Amino acid sequence: CKIYMHNVLVSIIMPMHNSASYVGEAITSVLKQTYPHWELLVIEDASKDNSCDIVRTYQEQDSRIHLLINDHHTGRPSSPRNMGVKHAKGRYIAFLDSDDVWFPEKLQQQIPLFEDEKVAIVYSNYEKMDEAGHRANRVVKAPPCATYNQLLSGNVIGNLTGIYDRQKVGKVEFLHAHHED
């Protein structure tokens, strides 16, 4: 089972709107992952800058990167996330916004936790960054455990930290809320 779990595909969903200033850094953080079995689905949400050109440059370097185009700007990240989940091929679904970055070992450390049959969602603490992309030394602590009712009542998990197992959780759709995380 361990060999199987460590080779399972992770689909990373990245909504993008006018992200030319930072999408390259977000994609680079995915490319640096020590866990190699992933696909990155970047969902373009009608940007007016050259975000798509930047993503296409990365696509030319790595076939695991896919660009999906949303015809019109939805004004919220829920619609692009839902589009990404719909096209995802992986058993595991992870989320990374185009203005966030991951540590290189993020997937390598989180995926083995799914070997416990009771684990359906994995998440962690995260550190905030300032506008210039520098670490702000402000850690947002996640609760050690989140119940189903807590998940229904509000977002206790930092979006960029969460991964869920589709086989255990089933279909997940984001409501059309206006907040990002």
Where are these predicted regions, by residue range?
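N-proximal low-complexity "stem/linker" segments adjacent to membrane-targeting elements
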Residues: 1-31
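A conserved acidic beta->alpha catalytic loop
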Residues: 44-53, 72-74, 97
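The conserved acidic donor/metal-binding loop of glycosyltransferases
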Residues: 97-101, 125
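Conserved donor NDP-sugar-binding/catalytic core segment of glycosyltransferases
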Residues: 105-136
